[in-house]
Amino acid sequence: MTFTKAAPGAAFVTAIRAMLLRDMGGCISPVHAFIFLQGLETLSLRVERHVENALKVVQYLNNHPQVERVHHPSVSSDPEQQALYQKYFPNGGGSIFTFEIKGGKETAKKFCDNLELFSLLANVADVKSLVIHPASTTHAQLSEEELNEQGIYSNTIRLSIGTENIDDIIEDLEGGFQSV
């Protein structure tokens, strides 16, 4: 970019601003920095709760008759993956994972729509539990073949487990299963 052509009257200032934003990013205000630091102080506690809840949900889903398969490192049948999981995640894996519900696309969508505690959102790692049907939302632009290549099927559901009471989370999931 030529700044003398883009902003002839303020080329130097524009160049400095553009380079600073590109190289260093935007600067947050003091208030936002304070809020960020406040959240950082409790991050380890929140992650601990996320992981603890996720492991319980994974076990619940892994034993549920309406679930085809759970994709989480804690339930892998591959001995090599289990060894890596134990080595790198001694306190448990992440709180974001997918599972396949028995049935097709409509079953998966109905399950998601009937959850009450879970929010139907595309973002992840929130304090609240989130659910989404990737094939009809975040990956809707892909063909069925492309989805399958990425391990996303019409019955795949992605969960991001939050910090709510685990009994409430499992009760909500059970309500979703009862609706299908």
For each predicted feature, which ranges?
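PLP-dependent enzyme catalytic core of the Aspartate aminotransferase-like
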Residues: 113, 129-180
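Active-site C-terminal subdomain of aminotransferase-like
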Residues: 1-96, 100-128
